[in-house]
């Protein structure tokens, strides 16, 4: 006889967290914010050419179905009735671009990932077209014209992929970020799937006006993007549609936030001036600026932080983005073989406790905030014969911390009020060496929740609080207090300053590596195109001349 189901856990809310490296599904108790069960599936990335990064949208979708099914099985093993799951929220890697056929449900091309650099020429061409106001794009979107954002990725597909061109001509194509692809598929796909996104994801496309909270025709005309490709834009917390298949059939999807905005909500940074830093594939520092857009003068982005209800106001954030954080650990493991598992880097760094003067700038995809320098490339400098893999491991962790400090300093200048502590989350925060390094380099306390899944928690909170679900209260007095671990600085401020100044020198050396100019302005191709006869005759003349000069008979 089956064990009786537990009824005391109260209403539950699920959260899909779709990231660059993995997909997870997590289930929380809406009354206590307790994480009850979860499942994770690792994802592959494809690198067809240098600087290109793609993922298979169907693999991503299948990973979501698998995570939901396995988590529900685990809940069943815990005697928890999955009918208690009242809503599902979605959190996703932002900017990553998908275009698919609405009649077949098939992707028309691989998802072009946020890290992808193929659109550099597209960006250069577009920058020449910008009207007289050089801030035309940024004033509407809060974003610089960059390879990072979705509009240029979509423009590249429209220019280069025949399948996409044909589907657009025939009115079959739909565009979206990962959230749009997942929600459309989960709510029925070709059989009535809801084509939508939320304000936080829309604000990362470079097609969305962050003041009017609508798609901007002038921007769409500038990028030559047909507006009928675009999803409907909703708030971050409302019922979008019902799941149409699987263990959670009939459960509403009622929350949607880009991953970094979800983490801001999950860290409960609802007050102006509160900030969090998420350490994942990249590093993302967001500071809540309230109901006003603050435009940075120091290389940061202005973005929509959240809009928790159809009739609720939008809140904004300043954001600094680091392209390579956790990705550097993957690179050390997969490309160099310095470590076998991600956990090895903490052990190696702890062995030496210093980089011994070695500095690592992991600008594999150029530099993001505050430089926005696509010509930069990764460098290791300060190496000696004494340098070993432990020092390089330490330098890799230190690089993440230095990049965070650069963003924090820019944010302090823009906001005018220095942060007194930094709230952190993300997979890398399990690395205690990294967290202590971060406190040392910032010289302020770093505060980490014991429950690190704040991105999932934010998506669950938005879903549970939606009108028509209402199982999660976002009133300040009702919010669950997360238990925190605190890391205090353990070095003198002068030492921190010296190390940071040396890092800045290394950053300067990383810039300008990628250039369309040949060395010395010459054309090296001429040296590979000499006629064979000329080469032989000239070589004989030089040989005879050399023998004559040396006095050889």
Curated annotation (Swiss-Prot):
Keyword field contains Transmembrane: yes
Pathway it works in: Polyol metabolism; glycerol degradation via glycerol kinase pathway; sn-glycerol 3-phosphate from glycerol: step 1/1
Spans through the membrane: 526-546
Membrane-topology annotation of the record: Single-pass type IV membrane protein
GO cellular component, one term: sperm mitochondrial sheath
Reactions listed under catalytic activity: glycerol + ATP = sn-glycerol 3-phosphate + ADP + H(+)
Localisation: Mitochondrion outer membrane; Cytoplasm
Pfam families: FGGY_C, FGGY_N
Tissue specificity annotation: Testis-specific. Expressed in the midpiece of spermatozoa.
Keywords per UniProt: ATP-binding, Cytoplasm, Differentiation, Glycerol metabolism, Kinase, Membrane, Mitochondrion, Mitochondrion outer membrane, Nucleotide-binding, Spermatogenesis, Transferase, Transmembrane, Transmembrane helix
Residues reported to bind substrate: 20, 94, 148, 259
GO molecular function: ATP binding; glycerol kinase activity
Enzyme class: transferase
Keyword Chloroplast in record: no
Binding locations of ATP: 24, 281, 326, 427-431
A GO biological-process term: glycerol catabolic process
InterPro entries named among the record's database cross-references: ATPase_NBD, Carb_kinase_FGGY, Carb_kinase_FGGY_CS, FGGY_C, FGGY_N, GK1-3_metazoan-type, Glycerol_kin
Signal peptide: none
EC numbers, comma separated: 2.7.1.30
Primary location: mitochondrion
Family: Belongs to the FGGY kinase family.
NCBIfam families assigned: glycerol_kin, PRK00047.1
Function: Key enzyme in the regulation of glycerol uptake and metabolism. Essential for male fertility and sperm mitochondrial sheath formation. Required for proper arrangement of crescent-like mitochondria to form the mitochondrial sheath during spermatogenesis. Can induce mitochondrial clustering through interactions with PLD6 and up-regulation of phosphatidic acid synthesis in the mitochondria.
Assembly and binders: Interacts with ARMC12. Interacts with PLD6.
Annotated protein name in UniProt: Glycerol kinase 2
Organism of origin: Homo sapiens (Human)
């Amino acid at each position: 006889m089956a064990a009786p189901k537990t009824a005391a856990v109260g209403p539950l809310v699920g959260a899909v967290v779709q990231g660059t490296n993995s997909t997870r599904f997590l289930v929380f108790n809406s009354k206590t914010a307790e994480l009850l069960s979860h499942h994770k599936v690792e994802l592959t990335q494809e690198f067809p050419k240098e600087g290109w990064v793609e993922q298979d949208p169907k693999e991503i979708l299948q990973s979501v179905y698998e995570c939901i099914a396995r988590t529900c099985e685990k809940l069943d093993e815990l005697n928890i009735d999955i009918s208690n799951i009242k809503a599902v929220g979605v959190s996703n890697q932002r900017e990553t671009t998908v275009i698919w056929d609405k009649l077949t449900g098939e992707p028309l091309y691989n998802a072009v990932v946020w890290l992808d650099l193929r659109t550099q020429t597209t960006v250069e061409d577009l920058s020449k077209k910008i009207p007289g106001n050089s801030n035309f794009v940024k004033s509407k979107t809060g974003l610089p014209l960059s390879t990072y954002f979705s509009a240029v990725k979509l423009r590249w597909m429209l220019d280069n992929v025949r399948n996409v061109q044909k589907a657009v001509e025939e009115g079959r194509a739909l565009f979206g970020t990962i959230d749009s692809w997942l929600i459309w598929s989960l709510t029925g796909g070709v059989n009535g799937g809801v084509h939508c996104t939320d304000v936080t994801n829309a604000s990362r496309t470079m097609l969305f006006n962050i003041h009017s909270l609508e798609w901007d025709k002038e921007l769409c005309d500038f990028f030559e993007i047909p507006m009928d490709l675009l999803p409907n834009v909703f708030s971050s917390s409302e019922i979008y549609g019902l799941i149409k298949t699987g263990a959670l059939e009939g459960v509403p999807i009622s929350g949607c936030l880009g991953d970094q905005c979800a983490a801001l909500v999950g860290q409960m940074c609802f007050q102006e001036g509160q900030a969090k830093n998420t350490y994942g594939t990249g590093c993302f520092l967001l500071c809540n600026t309230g109901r006003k857009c603050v435009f940075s003068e120091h290389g940061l982005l202005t973005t929509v932080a959240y809009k928790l209800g159809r009739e609720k106001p939008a809140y904004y954030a300043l954001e600094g983005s680091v392209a390579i954080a956790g990705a550097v650990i993957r690179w050390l493991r997969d490309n160099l073989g310095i470590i076998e598992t991600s956990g090895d880097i903490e052990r190696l760094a702890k062995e030496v406790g210093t980089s011994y003067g070695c500095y690592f700038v992991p600008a594999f995809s150029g530099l993001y905030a505050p430089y926005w320098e696509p010509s930069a490339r990764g460098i290791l400098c300060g190496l000696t014969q004494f340098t070993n893999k432990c020092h390089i491991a330490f330098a890799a962790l230190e690089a993440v911390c230095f990049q965070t400090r650069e963003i924090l300093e820019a944010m302090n200048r823009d906001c005018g009020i220095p942060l007194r502590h930094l709230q952190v989350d993300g997979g890398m925060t399990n690395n205690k060496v990294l967290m202590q390094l971060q406190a040392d380099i910032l010289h302020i306390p770093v505060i980490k929740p014991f429950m690190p899944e704040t991105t999932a928690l934010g998506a669950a909170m938005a879903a549970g609080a939606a009108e028509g679900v209402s199982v999660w209260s976002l009133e300040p007095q009702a919010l669950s207090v997360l238990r925190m671990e605190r890391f205090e600085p353990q070095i003198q401020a002068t030492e921190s300053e010296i190390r940071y100044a040396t890092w800045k020198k290394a950053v300067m050396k990383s810039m300008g590596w990628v250039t369309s100019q040949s060395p010395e302005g010459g054309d090296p191709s001429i040296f590979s195109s000499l006629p064979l006869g000329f080469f032989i005759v000239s070589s004989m003349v030089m040989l005879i001349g050399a023998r004559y000069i040396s006095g050889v008979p």
